[in-house]
Amino acid sequence: MVSDAPNSSWHPAMMPNSIADLRNRREDTVPPSAPEGSVLEDNTTQSNTAGEESGAWFQDDGTGDDWLADTNNAPESEPTPAPASAPDTETPEQTGPAESVEEAVPEESSTTSKHLSTMSFTRTVPHEVNWNDDDDAEWSLPRTDTDPFKFIPETNRTNSFPTVSPLEDRAHGAAQEFDHPISFNPAEDLIREIEEEESREDGTLPGAAAESATQNAQDDTTTQQYLTGGPDAVANDALGARFEEGLPLVSSADQDATQEGQQEAGGDLFAEETVGEEDDFFSNVRSDEATQQDDDFQPTPVQRKSTMDVLNSLDMPSTGTGFVPLEETVEEPEAQESPQDQPKAQEGENLDEKWKEMFGDDDAEEGFLPDESTGPNELDASAFLGSDDEGLLEDSETEQQEQSQPLASPGYVSASGPSAQPVNGQYFPHNQGPAVPTPTNPYLPAVSPVTPAHSYLPAAPVSAAQPPTAAPYAPPSTAPPAPALAQFGYGAPPPTQEKNKAQSFVDKKGGYTSPYDLPMEVVKPKRRAGALPLQNNTSGPNSPSTMPPPPRSASMYSQPSPSTGAPTPGTARPASSHSAQAPSSGRKPSHESFFEDLPMTTKPRPASRPKPKSAAPNLVPAAPPVASSRYSPAPPGAPLTNGPAPAPVSSRYSPAPPAPRQPSGGHERSRAHAPVGHVEGSLAERRSSSSLHDHRLQRVPSLPSTREVEEEEVPTQAQASPGGPAPPHPMSPPVSRYAPSPQGARQTPPHTAPSGQTVLSPPKRVMSSHSPLAPPYDFAPPPRSQTQSPGALYGNRATKPVEPIPRPSSVHDPTSPREAAYPAAPASFAPVAPATTYGRPRVPRYGMNQSIPAVIRSPGEVKIQNIKDIIPFEERLAKFPGPLKGKSKKKETIAWLTAGIESLEQGLPTSFSLHTPFSHDDKRAVERVLLWKILRVFVEHDGVLEGNPTVDKAVRDLLSPGLEGADSTTPYVNGGGNFGLADPASAGLQSDGVSSSTVEQIRRQLLSGDHEKAIWAAADQRLWGHALLLSNALAPNLYKQVAQEFIKKEVNSPGRNNESLAALYGVLSGNHEESVDELVPSHARAGLQLVTTHAASSPSKDAMEGLDKWRETLGLILSNRSTDDGRAINSLGVLLSGYGRAEAAHVCFMFARNHTVFGGLDDPASHFVLVGSDHKKQAEQFAKEIEPLLLSEVYEYGQSLAGGFSVPVTNPHLAAYKLQHAIALAEYGFRDKALQYCDAIATAITSQTKRSPYHHPILENAVEDLMMRLKQAPREDSGSWIPKPTMNKVSDTVWSKFNKFVSGDDDGSGQGPTGEGEPGPFSRVAGGTPTISRSPSASNLETFGAAVPSYGMSSSLPNGPVPASAPATRAASRYAPGAPQATGSNSRPSTSAYAPRSSMERTSSELNRGSFEVPRRSLEMQAGHRGSYSPVRSGSPAAMYTPQSTDFGSPQQSPYQPVSHAQPTPFQAPTSAPQPVGYPGPPANGVAPGQESEAPGQSPEASGYQPPSYGYEPPSFTPYEAPTEEKDGTPEETPNGGSYEAPSYQPYSYEPPSYEPDTQPSNEDAGSDDESKPKPKKKGIMYDDDDDFPTPRPAEKSRAEKDRENDEMFRKAAEEDAQRVEAAKQAKKGWGFTSWFGGGGAKKDAATPDSKGANPNKPIRAKLGEANSFYYDPELKRWVNKNAGPEDTAKKATPPPPKAGAPRSVSASPASPPFSPGPGRGASAPPPMGGAGGPPRSASRPPTSSGSTDTTGLPGSPGSVAGGALGPPPGPVAMLRSVSNTSTASAPPLGGGGSGVGGGGGGGPPPSSRPPTSLSNSSSIDDLLGAAGPRKPGAARKARKGARYVDVMGEVKGWRGGEEWVRLG
């Protein structure tokens, strides 16, 4: 209802400039009606006239749009009368006697506050008649009649009795004027009408007022609520008017109540109207009881008694000054008179019927609303009518009553309330309403208004006890609301709305004395709804009764408290009935403005009335209820819960959504029941702008300025305010018409109430149990649902405003410290499923100096559990035997499927049959089991589902389980129970008889060659045999069409239940894709339904029923196979899939594999992606379950069993899903299964020659990452402590061991990069740290000696240059200790290069063996260059040795062992040192860069010894000490000697001398060795190192010469070596151990040296391989060729250091020790063969080469000593740069030799010179064999191999530095 429309009679713009204008306009707008005038004059007459006119007027209104339009046209005068005195107003408005109405209006206007005018308070004078116009306009064109309110003084216009006087005046002829006035400029019209009304009220009020009072007492139950808004306005003009209208009306109401009972037809115009229209309308809208009650009451309201009743019941009168006395005086009588008036209602029953026709339907009422929406009055009416469906009448009656009651009723019971209630309760029978007349105080009316308030609530009478119910949605705290609620199904609040609506509606429609009040109530009442309606109706706007009181400022004020209580119901009521009124929110602004005025007026009066509303004050926001839809708890007003005025201000439609609904909602119904009253409310809302102003004007006396402010606020607040007390309701006033904005809920009455209730909002709060304390005006609780839930109706949600957000269960903020203190049970999950949890138990603990324990939370026990124990994996899924591969899994798969089927069948519907209706889920459950069974058959028969009798039978049993027992003769008919096939109805399917004429026609057509016509002629005559035969033979293209026709007409005609058979025929006829149309017709799939034209056809059935016959259809097709029938099966699957039957569809797809695509989700052609999962219809669930993946894997497995070429081995798109499954398994702790899936995926990816796009890198990476994580995760615990071996593990272990032994890798050195020989937690430790901790022996100390004199812990430090030695993670391994030390030695050498090594030091080789054996004293460990313990002032001994010692705890690591005698050599060693430096990087010690580079070279080969004991002391390497040995040592250096030689080197450096004899023979080769050493010249590095160390350079020269010789020897040896290598390989391949043995045979003689020079051993093995007989030499720890001569053994023992690139660098260093004590060393060399031969290391230099070399290196120099005397021997030995050599095998021999020679031979210098040579040679050999391996352990290993190759090369004898050495070359 467009309350604000400028054309509205109440609209400010439409207000008349003068009363004359109003009259003119009214006359123009509405033709005066004599009956109306009569009615106006006499209350009884008015009542009758009201009934009549109500009929007419309501008919118009009922018509809705027309009447509303008229109402709009009749600006204020028409609408105003109707609202003013519900019936009377209607009568003037409808009757059309504008003059009468206008006359009445002037009189009333005098009495009535001009504030009642529709115009805003500021715009309109208190005498404004717009109020009445609004009501009338709201109802219909009679708004001109509504002008009677304008002709009535403002006081009369108010909902208070003064409005009644105008009705009387109107009855006398003012009605016609009243019709005219507002048609003019709204402002002028209003002014004119006001003036006229005042004058008329003054003149006619006494008589008319009495009559009006009588009728109004009855009608005003409805009208008063409306009028209550008016009374507020009247309060401005009409204390007198109110008195006239109120007291006189009360008297007349009392008198006329009885009279009206007699005069229903006659009496007061308003009474008649009220009776007729209101009662008729209410009776129509409401139940018959409501109609009767309305009839009974409406006469009284017509007399204005209803107004009193409303005020009394609603306590609304408190809002109006005039109403207070009226309510007090007349409320009780009115309650009684209401029954008298009810007879009028009976008279008006005709109107009721009309109203029923017009408004009985919510939609019709909504229609009115739109019409009213059209005009200002119409808008109000439409808004009101919109809500009238459920709450309009209630609002009219209830609003009026609520105006009376909600004010008093919210918390109080008013006698008048009950009486008014019946009238007001649109949906409550008026009879019921009257039953509650107890409260006499009009302002404390029982909740009776509440009961009627809700239009949709039954019009159960609301007793005074029901005041709280006044609020249709949430009666405040009043008990009565419950009864009302009982009727309404909600709270009493709805009844309040009914009353207001009934009365308001009458006022609105019937032209109550203060129709403007109703509009104002509609608008203002919204505000009051915020206050009163909120009190009555939490939804506020819905409580019309609540609204009306506000218009009466005084009375309303006193009543608002109750009303405030009522407003909650009112608010609720809007939610329920006025949700349609929510639109009234739209006009609500007007109403609220109007009601704001009313509340303002009310506020002064509430002073007296507050007591009733004491509780209601909370509901001051009741105004919002007005705005709130009747059915939605005044959502708009929610924010305005605290103040009704704000909500009312907003146009009734202000809560836009509610406004539209208001018309359809309670307002509509209110109109239907109480046209005038409700119209009044509607008009008020429409007028919200001007009407509110009117109310302000009228209320000005009471509280004009405040109201005025509220008016402005109301539009905004009104919308919110409706939800004030019940903001939730305002919020709830959704767009639903039942949830109109609370303001629109009970527009008129609520608005009126809100005014008073604004003051009384707190009382409302108190009063309305449903609406807790109203939230602040700005507070908007969440919107309430628009449903009619009890909460919505009663305003239960209104309570929400108090606490919109429920308090958290815990008072502590989650982030508060206290909250954090609560115990928690953290849980963490590891990558592979363990879950770690711990609690925080409270434990008593004693603090210091405390005698009492304090209970504190301390870390609890940590519990580690497997996640599968906590969250077990579903057993059926966990037992899946996947990944499925090979026929071995077939049995397990079938067993798994069988178990799954059994478990699934347990959950099936108990009584399933094909004909039993089941839900979609039940059907899918059955089909799911079928899918599992089909898969089991698929696997059992190796991927075959058809083609052999066994499979066919198995499938048939699944698809047609009852087929076997059926009679074979009638399998489909008698067996129809199973198939749903043809039934007896099929008997009707008979082809037409063959007529001779038809056959003749066919014959002729065939003769003419027109076979197509012949075919169709036969088909048309149902000669299907002819047609099919001809088409098949002559026109194959027509055959399918003819077959379709035959199937359609003869097989699958409607009702035959032959869908499956028809589908089979379609398949057989070749219509594969179309055959499924027989199951589900195409029109059904398109969502259409066809209507059969056959009269005999059976009743239509669900077109989807055929879909349930898919199993039967599939069985028919499979049992009758035809060409390409797979396409039909596929089509059937597609059809099923389209209807969400995934399992059934996949069964079909499995049978049509050749026509179905089983592909990825990204492939649009894929029919299914995962078996049992719908990727189209249920994409959100797709792939989220594991079962479909498992079924898909089973399907894939079945395909693989089929073995057909067309069947892919794997379905690539499943790889990602399998990975997902693997992850799930891992998460649940099934590590091994997850690994198996990863392996299967990886295999599938690599097995395909052409990679599938699904096997992309991302998938590969994900699989690889998961595999790595799973492998690192702990294995699942086994039941036994004994590991369960597997063949793979056993075979892998055996072969790995064998291969390692053959290759020499498994010597246990662990120096290899992998350190395989040293399992354990330290196996991967880098930096050369020993894998296994050594005993704290001197050796270890020696290793560290450099840094820490004897302990050299730093040598062990991995952080040092260890990296160089580190190369062998296990460099520390017994054989490779030296190698790692190389790094250390490098570090040390640089520093300690100068530090003399004691002759006792061992060479690196010694160190290696030292690692093998428990090293001797650190001194011995130091043997050679690396006396780590030797505090030799290595520049940075720690750094030097650190790496190496780390790698090798063994002596080598202590490269810096101080070799006392070798000290001189150390200077030479520096030359060698450069090699070590390079190797370990210990150069930090001060080793020259050159050294560093060399050291690296050494480290690879002889990583064990790598660093000469001194930073640059490579010469100290024993290898170099003995010319040959150095060579050997060099090759062996880190890799060879380091790891492997150690064993041979076990003997200490002193032992090698025992091999001296071998060394001597080697002397022959010395030259050659020297020759071979020239190659080491390639060791430019060595030279560089020497350059770096000037001292070594002099030695280098001699070395160069020797190297040249050695190079030649090496070359020769290399050739032999190459041959031997191949032989070794062949031997290795041929007879396994022989290759081993071969390797060892050659080494036999040089066992010790060779072992050290593991690398040379390989070549040696090759040579030995050539020899056929081998034996294992325990001393050499090798297999030795029996046939091999001593030379061979020597060769083996003294393999040159070719591979040791590092040695070469060492040799460069040895250059410094080159003091050619070589000869001395040479002597020592033999011992290495013998002594060292035992030790593996000596083997590397078996011939004593190491010894001799070392000795040669420096018989007197530390280098030579280091080389030859590795430990104890002369200092020169220590100096020997043999470090690199030492690392190979040379070190041990050198050690040995060194000891013997170095010590004895003391040829420290010679050895040193030799060592350099050998080093250089070895480096050259390395070049030949390959670049020296990295300084890392791995490289060292390789170096060992290289050394072996060198050994293989044969034995080379030569002299280095005057020392003979033997070399295998």
Swiss-Prot record:
Residues 469-483, 724-733, 773-784 have a biased composition (Pro residues). GO terms for biological process: autophagy; Golgi organization; intracellular transport; protein localization to endoplasmic reticulum exit site; protein transport; vesicle-mediated transport. Residues 1-166, 193-820, 1301-1339, 1355-1665, 1681-1842 are annotated as: Disordered. Residues 1309-1318, 1790-1803 have a biased composition (Gly residues). Residues 85-99, 213-225, 553-585, 613-632, 1362-1377, 1539-1557, 1701-1710, 1735-1760, 1811-1833 have a biased composition (Low complexity). It is found in: Endoplasmic reticulum membrane. The keyword Endoplasmic reticulum applies. Keywords: Autophagy, Endoplasmic reticulum, ER-Golgi transport, Membrane, Protein transport, Transport. It comes from the Eukaryota. Pfam families: Sec16, TPR_Sec16. Residues 1-10, 41-51, 114-123, 252-262, 744-760, 1330-1339, 1382-1393, 1442-1474 have a biased composition (Polar residues). InterPro entries: Sec16_CCD, Sec16_Sec23-bd. GO terms for cellular component: endoplasmic reticulum exit site; endoplasmic reticulum membrane; ER to Golgi transport vesicle membrane. Its main location: endoplasmic reticulum. It is a peripheral membrane protein. Involved in the initiation of assembly of the COPII coat required for the formation of transport vesicles from the endoplasmic reticulum (ER) and the selection of cargo molecules. Also involved in autophagy. This is COPII coat assembly protein SEC16. The lineage of its organism: Eukaryota, Fungi, Dikarya, Ascomycota, Pezizomycotina.
